[in-house]
Structures are given as structure tokens and as C-alpha cells.
């Protein structure tokens, strides 16, 4: 038997293996993944429960992957066996890699969704509120599309005062992504200017998933997320759910539905305004009545504090003081009378006491006179006889009397006395 060198046997093995396993499909779990930053080549192992085989994915093929290769993924690789003669190693030179059970596009989309979710692209807290009464709306669509025609028709019926501006955009095929991104940036550039748009609507009618798949692109997602203007995604039909729907501030199932969601119904608002007017009139009448009652209350309060009222209160106080003085005067006279009655006749013979008695009598008459003046009515006069105040009931016909008040004095004679 011919003896072979190591190099010779490895060369023969290489020729045999590479010819026999020129194209193979192998399924297994990705492990030991290494991606070289400089070369861009990916090196990994594919394993099952019993064996492991090394694999290589060169940069050109790696760039065609629509998803990110990660440890632990169950993959089906398509390629050929290659042998490295110097070490006698063999590996699978991968041409294509597909996820097991799902397509590469689906996996790529799921990975992109997870990436954007972690960046907060889907968070409700980061979404802008829908404008209540839009005046100017940018519609990113094809100006010759049925979607644009439907949107204009619905807008004119619902809210004709809103200005719709079509930004003509390529909505499918090569160049679609870049065209949409540029249109979003253009519409958003008017933000905070007098020509600012209240909303940006990215709209396209239905089509195949291939036609709509551009709206799953990360660049469009970035443009929508970074826009400072409220955005809506209205792509395809109700059953179509794309990445742009998740990132935009609001999703509409169709372009027509976008107008129904975004624009208020003018007929409904006219009815509501009528209702508001009725409520406003009713509230105004109620408020007016309340204010009238309040003013009447204030007027009554002011009247109580008026000059006339104060004068009346002072008159009442004066009357009370007069009565109090009268009572004190009468009490004083009674005390003095009692004291005089207790003084004996013998004591009164004393010149000193007689003088005091006369003085006391004068004081008594003065007090009676003062007492009479206190009770004197507004148009009355004091009645006196022999310079002493007397009551009418003690007078008799023929008595000479004097009538006096603060302003005058008069003499009179009693003609008759009628006792009541």
C-alpha cells in the first residue's frame, strides 16, 4: 500500500469532501459566534444534542442577511463543505442562513421591533396628542392615488375649513423609503412657523405585503419618532399592521379612516354648539338672578347704615336715656320727701334748718320743673301757678296760670276743668 504524507491525505480528503458535499442544508443551534469587526466575517458553530460542526459566513453573504445572527438561534444553513489543508479542519462555508420555521424577514422585523421598543419608540408617554381642530394637515402620499382623492372628499364633508396639503411621495418600490423619509422631514420643517402643519399623515391604499413592506423600515420609524409634529400612519387596510403604525403617534386602518379620526364632524359640532348656547343662556339667567338678589341684599344693608337710620337709632337711644333720667329723678325726689317727713316740726323751727328747708323746696320745685321739661312733648308747654309747676288735675276755674317752654312764656286763666 502506498504511503501518503499528511498533506497528501488532507488534499485528497478536501477533494472528496468538497465534491461530495458541494451543496448541503444543515439545521442546528448557533453557538460560539464571533463576528470580526475588521473583516466583517462571522465564525460560529452549529450544534445539536450529539455533534458540532464549524461554520463560516463571509462578509459578502453576511451583508445580505435581513436579521442579526445571535447565539442560541435555531437556524438552517445552506452552503458547502470546505477543508483547510494545513490543519486538516473542515467547516461549512455558508451561502445563506434562514431561521427555522419562520422567514428571515419575519425574524428581522421582530428583532427591529425589540430594538425600537427598548429605545422607547412605542411608549405612549412619547407620543404627541391629537390636535382637536386641525387647520393645516400634510398628507404624505402619491398625488395621483385613490387614497388622496378619498381623503380630500371626506375632509371637505367633515371639516371644510381644514387645509389639506399633499406632499407627492413615492409610496412603493425602490426609493420608497428615502422618499417617505424626506417628505416627513420636509413637512416637519415647518414646525413652530406660521405655516406649521397641525398633523402629518402618511397614507397609502392597500396592496401586497411586498408593496407595503417598506413601511417596516427603520429609517421611516426614525423619521416618525423624531418628528415634532403630530403624525398618523394610515397604510393599507385594517388587517395590515406595520412598524410605522407602532411608531406614529396614532394609527388609522385606512387613509379614509385617518380623516375620520383626525378631523371633527362639523355637523356634530354645530349641534353641540347649539346645546352649549342653550346651557350658556340658562346659566347666565341664573347668575343674573343671583346677582340681583345679592344686590338687593346689599341695598338693604346699606339702608340700615344710612343717615336716616342712624338718626332713628340715636333717637331710640335718647328716649332710653330720658326714661332712665326720669326714673332717677323721681327716685331722688322720693328719697328727699321721705327725709323731710322724718324731720320734726320742732326741728323745722330752727332758723338754720328753716333756711335749708326753703332751699330744699326751691330745689324740689326746680327738679319738678326739670322733670316736667323732660316729659314735655314736642309742641307742649309747662303749666305753673305762683311760680310752681302744677298738674292740670289740681287746677280749678278762675286760677291764674303761666304756660312756658324753651321758646316763650304766656299767662292764662282757667275757665273750666273737665276731669277725665
UniProtKB/Swiss-Prot annotation:
InterPro entries the record matches: Exonuc_VII_L, Exonuc_VII_lsu_C, OB-fold_nuc-bd_dom
Keyword Nuclease among UniProt keywords: yes
GO terms of biological process kind: DNA catabolic process
Major localization class: cytoplasm
TM spans (from-to): none
Record flagged with keyword Cytoplasm: yes
Subcellular location: Cytoplasm
Pfam families in alphabetical order: Exonuc_VII_L, tRNA_anti_2
EC annotation from Swiss-Prot or TrEMBL: 3.1.11.6
Cellular-component GO terms for this entry: cytoplasm; exodeoxyribonuclease VII complex
Keywords associated with the record: Cytoplasm, Exonuclease, Hydrolase, Nuclease
Reactions that this protein is recorded to catalyse: Exonucleolytic cleavage in either 5'- to 3'- or 3'- to 5'-direction to yield nucleoside 5'-phosphates
Source domain of life: Bacteria
Record-level Gene Ontology MF annotations: exodeoxyribonuclease VII activity; nucleic acid binding
Record-stated family: Belongs to the XseA family.
Subunit description: Heterooligomer composed of large and small subunits.
NCBIfam families named among the record's database cross-references: xseA
Protein name listed in UniProt: Exodeoxyribonuclease 7 large subunit
Native species: Helicobacter pylori (strain G27)
